[in-house]
Amino acid sequence: MMTPTRQLLLLAALLLGLSSCKHNATTPQDAFSIDILPKKKEYHLGDTLQISIHHPRFEGSVQQTSYQIHQQPVTTLGDKIVLENLLLGKQFLSVSVQTNDGKQDTVKKPLLILAQHTPKLLSYRILNEYPHDKEAYTQGLEFIGDTLVESTGQYKQSSIRKWNPFTEEVYQNVPLQPIYFGEGATVFRGKILQLTWRENIGFVYDQQLKVVKTFAYGKSKEGWGLCHNGTDKLYKSDGTEKIWLLHPETFAEIDSLQLCTDKSLYTYANELEFANGKIYANTFLKDGIMIINPENGAIEGVVDVRGLKDKVEKTPDVDVLNGIAYHPIRHTFFITGKNWSKIFEVVFLPND
C-alpha cells in the first residue's frame, strides 16, 4: 500500500514541470477599497472570506452590496462570502456597492482560487495490446463504434484517418497540406473536427473526410487537444493552463476553464477525451493522465501510466504518450503515443 507521502511525491513527479502561473493583476481603485480576510496569496474552493469596505469616497450610506466572480453571484453570509460553485484559477472578485442616494460603484480584486482536494492517484491494468502504425505521430484519438478517428502531426506528415484497431483495417487516410501540423480531433454532431498546431485554423470534415468548413481560433494561440461532452460542449486545450469552451455551432471560443490542483495552476493538457462526465487529458512530456472536472477545472485525479512506453518497439522516432480514446461499449480506454508500435486497451484502477 502506498503511503500518503509517497502518493504526494508521485503526483508531483507526474505533474511537476508544468508551468504554474502567478496572479499578478493589479487592483482597480474606485470610490472605495476592499480588504479580504484572511489575507492569502491563494484560496481554495470551499473557503469562507470576510469582506470589509474601507475609505468610501462617496456620499450617503451603503444600502446594498453584491458580489460576483466570473459574472456569477457569490454565496454570502452577512459580510462573508463562500467560495463554492465557482470556476477555479485566476479570477476577479467584483464588489458592487449601492448607496441610499442611488449611486453605484464597483471595484474588482484578483483572487487565485485552487481546488479543494488533492488529486487521487490511479494506476492501470492492460487488457489487450493491438498493433499501431509506428509512422503515426498521434495527436488526436476518438472512437466511432469500433472505428478509431486518428489525427496525426508533423509538418509534411500530418493526416486524418479512420481505422479499426481490432482488424487493423485502415478505411481512409487523408493527408493534410504540408503547411499544416495536425493536432487534436473529435467527432461532434456527425462531423469530424481537427485542430492544427500554430496555423490558427481548425478543419470540419464530413464522414468521408472531406473538408466542409474551417474555423479560426480566438485568444488561444495554438491548438492541442479537442473533445466534447456528447451534447453541447466542446473543449479545446492550447498548452496553457486553460481549456477553452467552444461554441457548438461556430466553434468560437466563448469561455475557459483553468486547470488547478489544491497546490497550483497547471499547464500542458494535451490530447483530450471526455468520458464518464470527466475530461481525461494526456499530460505533455509526462507519463500521466489528468482527470479534470469540466465544471470548474479541478484536477481530481492523475493516472500513472508509466511503463507503457517500455512495451513498444524502440525506434529512433518513438516519442511521448499521446492519444486516449474511450470505448463506451467495452468501458475501456485505448492509449497510445507518438510513433508507438502498439495501442493498449486498459482500465484505470484506484491506487489503494
Predicted regions and their residues:
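Conserved beta-strand positions in repeat-built beta-propeller and related beta-rich domains
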Residues: 150-154, 194-199, 234-240, 281-285, ...
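A short helix->beta-strand "capping" segment at the edge of beta-propeller domains
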Residues: 114-135, 165-171
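A short beta-strand motif characteristic of beta-propeller blades
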Residues: 125-131, 169-175, 210-216, 255-264, ...
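Beta-rich, blade/repeat-based domains predominating
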Residues: 134-145, 178-189, 219-232, 263-275, ...
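Beta-strand-rich domains and repeat architectures in extracellular enzymes and scaffolds
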Residues: 127-159, 173-186, 337-339
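Surface-exposed, short loops/turns at beta-strand junctions within beta-sandwich domains
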Residues: 83-90
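Short loop/turn segments that connect beta-strands within beta-propeller blades
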Residues: 163-168, 206-210, 248-251, 293-297, ...
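C-terminal motif of bacterial Sec signal peptides marking the signal peptidase cleavage site
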Residues: 17-20
